[in-house]
Amino acid sequence: MGGFKIPNYEGVDPTGSWYSVLTPLLFLERAGKYFKDKTAVVYRDSRYTYSTFYDNVMVQASALMRRGFSREDKLSFISRNRPEFLESFFGVPYAGGVLVPINFRLSPKEMAYIINHSDSKFVVVDEPYLNSLLEVKDQIKAEIILLEDPDNPSASETARKEVRMTYRELVKGGSRDPLPIPAKEEYSMITLYYTSGTTGLPKGVMHHHRGAFLNAMAEVLEHQMDLNSVYLWTLPMFHAASWGFSWATVAVGATNVCLDKVDYPLIYRLVEKERVTHMCAAPTVYVNLADYMKRNNLKFSNRVHMLVAGAAPAPATLKAMQEIGGYMCHVYGLTETYGPHSICEWRREWDSLPLEEQAKLKARQGIPYVSFEMDVFDANGKPVPWDGKTIGEVVMRGHNVALGYYKNPEKTAESFRDGWFHSGDAAVVHPDGYIEIVDRFKDLINTGGEKVSSILVEKTLMEIPGVKAVAVYGTPDEKWGEVVTARIELQEGVKLTEEEVIKFCKERLAHFECPKIVEFGPIPMTATGKMQKYVLRNEAKAKANKEKS
């Protein structure tokens, strides 16, 4: 693959000891052997070691194999952040198959589409989400396995009547005997993640064993994880390849603290009790966590390494995190790159800068993780100059780029071409080589011949005290083509007027970048928390057409 060829040196065994298939299953082999007594998982009031974790994976894998699950078979998993879900990142590939994590916030119709499109043989569903599947049971080809709800045993008993098998019954047929690693080809699939589909049907992103292995190693290196690390699962395991941490934690024998709901008092208690060192989340989670802790005069007793992605952290968020004992690290990536592909590598000399300047630097998507590649290309496929002004498209390649889209050769050819994955993100490259995304190409606003970055305007609006979330987009205008429009979601109890917002922007932005229209209200989101700007644009177009008629 990719031109790899074993050299024909005299006396060298071409099947020798110097080569092994790169797969994250090697991490579990090591952890199960050398970290037997180390705590692997904490979940509610229970905790267990890597010895037990290894045994559970063997039981899950062998139980599936005894049910006829074999090489390249798919298993969908719909669940909160539970230990059984974490174990499936190893158990399913140990059985030779492919794990298909599914967002439990999706509609029943969307769940059915993914289960069927992925050709899943089984679907394990956490009891709270069973009813969603039952609505489309007749459309699903896979066999449903119920993962019982520890919170509600009586409800699970009732739900049991709706399925042929429970997870507990499945694993009763398994064995703790060690299984050999089945992966013989590094580029065979290990997981199949579906994109959130902001504008259409979700696409199945094919991740391979080699990519999962090397992505995890990069996470460990970039975020300085080791045997003493404790990772809090604030990030859903179904989201963007779980950012690689389902494998990275096991690679170093770290402890996984499973959080099955976003509960800010609980997050604080777990960080303190378990001495959490790392966590991942979107900016809104950190904003709400800081708000809770500040209202209750709380601080973390140890520094927590907080990965943030999805949007650059605002200065107010950075300040709030510093005040409660958190350190924010901005990363960037997509499902197609197993989550993070680049990091805003922080330089010590930046610590002395004013917070506003630090925030501007940290807002950048930065440079690629070690051993990955990233660039910004113009329309002719050439790198843009490092001037911080010329806009191009972010392209990526490396070990952690997906194989393509499952059963979708047209979309694969569209995005994976000329040796690069084309992200669709518009960006500039600063003189120091750090990349900064200015927008999605489809979200750039063309007003009076000027191109306006919706992200730039959103960053500015997020500086207004009391603003919870912002979506900036273009609405049709006969004179200007489009005008800059902002939908603002306010924190509870906060009052703000359109005039105040526009005045704030005029003091900080060019006149053509300032919103001409400001609306207040909820922002439509996908099930994975991505803003659906196309919904707002469609509403604006419908309104404009109605006014014309």
UniProtKB/Swiss-Prot annotation:
The lineage of its organism: Archaea, Thermoproteota, Thermoprotei, Sulfolobales, Sulfolobaceae. Keywords: ATP-binding, Fatty acid metabolism, Ligase, Lipid metabolism, Magnesium, Nucleotide-binding. It comes from the Archaea. GO terms for biological process: fatty acid metabolic process. CoA binds at residues 448-450, 506, 514-516. Catalyzes the ligation of coenzyme A (CoA) to 4-hydroxybutyrate (4HB). It can also use butyrate, valerate, propionate, acetate and 3-hydroxybutyrate (3HB) as substrates. The keyword Protein biosynthesis does not apply. Its cofactor is Mg(2+); Mn(2+). This is 4-hydroxybutyrate--CoA ligase 2. Belongs to the ATP-dependent AMP-binding enzyme family. SUPFAM superfamilies: Acetyl-CoA synthetase-like (SSF56801). It catalyses: 4-hydroxybutanoate + ATP + CoA = 4-hydroxybutanoyl-CoA + AMP + diphosphate; acetate + ATP + CoA = acetyl-CoA + AMP + diphosphate; propanoate + ATP + CoA = propanoyl-CoA + AMP + diphosphate; a medium-chain fatty acid + ATP + CoA = a medium-chain fatty acyl-CoA + AMP + diphosphate. ATP binds at residues 195-203, 336-341, 425, 440, 530. One of its GO terms (molecular function) is medium-chain fatty acid-CoA ligase activity. It comes from Metallosphaera sedula (strain ATCC 51363 / DSM 5348 / JCM 9185 / NBRC 15509 / TH2). Its EC number is 6.2.1.40, 6.2.1.1, 6.2.1.2, 6.2.1.17.
